[in-house]
């Protein structure tokens, strides 16, 4: 948790609603313009993001990591799915960035219609005829990070991500896609 004049180590991925709202208010009072939150499936299930309406949301992946909490993959997916619809995501102009490489994404992207952008680290050429597909080519992974060419609908960008691993590259390009969509 950080904003101008404040920094602390978080005790949870996403704070409980009352504490989260107090922190968001303090950040606004410190003249922060944006908040970037990691929203866990636990926090969605426990209503920790009550009172938050997001401009944008990212679907990173769905793995078996949290089956200790969720009874099965379908209920885990249904919990994560809630983030992409009201009351959490703005209904008309909320931005959705989805990991095209995740097998669960087809269940979500069809529900979102034209509100979503797809991102891939596995496809080497755009297979889509729309303005909402982002992908990478020329990936190289080293001990110091990852490099690639990031293809947007309008340009190609040489990227260096100072984090190791394909999942970190995917997380980075999804975050960059949000910034791109927000101009």
Where are these regions (language model features)?
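Short beta->alpha connector loops
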Residues: 40-43, 101-103
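Acidic, Mg2+-coordinating active-site environments of NTP-dependent enzymes
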Residues: 30-32, 56-183
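Short, hinge-like loop/turn segments at secondary-structure boundaries
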Residues: 9-14, 53-55, 113-115
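Conserved nucleotide-sensing/catalytic segment adjacent to the nucleotide-binding pocket
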Residues: 8-40
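Conserved helix/coil segment N-terminal to the catalytic DExD/H
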Residues: 43-50
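Short hydrophobic/charged patches on amphipathic alpha-helices used for structural packing
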Residues: 24-25, 46, 81
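Walker A (P-loop) phosphate-binding motif
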Residues: 1-9
């Amino acid at each position: 948790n950080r904003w101008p004049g404040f920094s602390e180590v978080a005790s949870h991925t996403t704070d409980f609603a009352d504490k989260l709202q107090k922190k968001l208010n303090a950040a606004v009072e410190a003249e922060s313009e944006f908040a970037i939150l990691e929203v866990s499936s636990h926090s969605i299930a426990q209503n920790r993001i009550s009172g938050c309406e997001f401009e944008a949301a990212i679907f990173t992946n769905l793995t078996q990591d949290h089956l200790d909490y969720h009874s099965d993959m379908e209920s885990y997916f249904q919990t994560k799915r809630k983030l992409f619809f009201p009351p959490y995501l703005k209904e008309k102009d909320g931005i959705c960035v989805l990991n095209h490489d995740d097998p669960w994404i087809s269940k979500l992207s069809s529900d979102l219609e034209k509100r979503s952008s797809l991102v891939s680290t596995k496809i080497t050429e755009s297979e889509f005829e729309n303005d909402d597909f982002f992908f990478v080519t020329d990936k190289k992974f080293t001990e110091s990070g990852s490099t690639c060419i990031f293809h947007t609908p309008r340009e190609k960008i040489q990227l260096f991500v100072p984090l190791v691993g394909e999942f970190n590259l995917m997380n980075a390009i999804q975050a960059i896609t949000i910034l791109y969509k927000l101009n």
